[in-house]
Amino acid sequence: MAPKLPRDNAQTAGQFIAATNGDADATQYGQSYHLAFADQAFLSRPEVRGIRFELELLKPDLALRERSIDHTIVVFGSARFVSRADAEQLVARAQDDSAALSANTALENSKHYESAREFGHFVAMYNQTQSDLHNRLHICTGGGPGIMEAANRGAFESGDLTIGLNISLPREQSPNPYITPGLAFRFHYFALRKMHFVMRARAIVVYPGGFGSFDELFEVLTLIQTKKIEPLPVILVDAEHWRTVVRFDLLVNQELIDANDLKIIHFVDTATDAWSIIRDWYELG
């Protein structure tokens, strides 16, 4: 029988509050008598911003460590794409030319959703060959709909852990249903969310998207270019799209970036090719 030795002798703050009736006396003595760590108004002050930064960094990090998650593959892309099945329903329900045009655009773009879903499946299948949890790669997304949902879904449907890093927005974005319970995190600060995207990332896979996807992509490219992080494969899915919307060659020709800056960028058209690049980069076999 294993000994039941405590890790330390200190009660947790929660245990102490429960045992002592917590902040009950604050009703008599006012807001100042609340325990600092239990005082929501105090923790929300501008002067305590640095502590909130630390908490948003620490909370997800501890949870991921407890699940032995050391490596992630981060998938970015539009929140607006839907599955082929959903797009086909939109086409069937369209009652005028405008709705039909929008529905057919959704149907065309659904190829990206299905590709991201397939990619999540490939990652999950690799993990099934790894008995050591610390060698596994896990899909990590922004936790919302569209491409984020698709990548989480592909891994989730294959029985794997998936991670979602959600953000609080004026128009609330709910986590998609394919994130593993306990691995859906909510951030207030974009900066801390971005830091968590990068901390464990072993590859970045980017599908077509809007401002948010561009922001996330170029943040990673800048961190690699300035040597703030080690080089890792940055994979852009739908080569024609990316070469059209971003003239990387023009940036090189005008000497705005170096040709070497593009060595980490890979243009692909399929989930299979995206996974092959990661497999070859890390010699996964």
Where are these regions (language model features)?
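Short, solvent-exposed amphipathic alpha-helical segments in soluble enzyme
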Residues: 90-92, 156-157, 219-224, 250-254, ...
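Phosphate/pyrophosphate-binding betaalpha-module
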Residues: 140-207, 211, 218
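Short, acidic/small-residue loops that bind anionic groups at enzyme active sites
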Residues: 159-172, 207, 221-245, 259-260
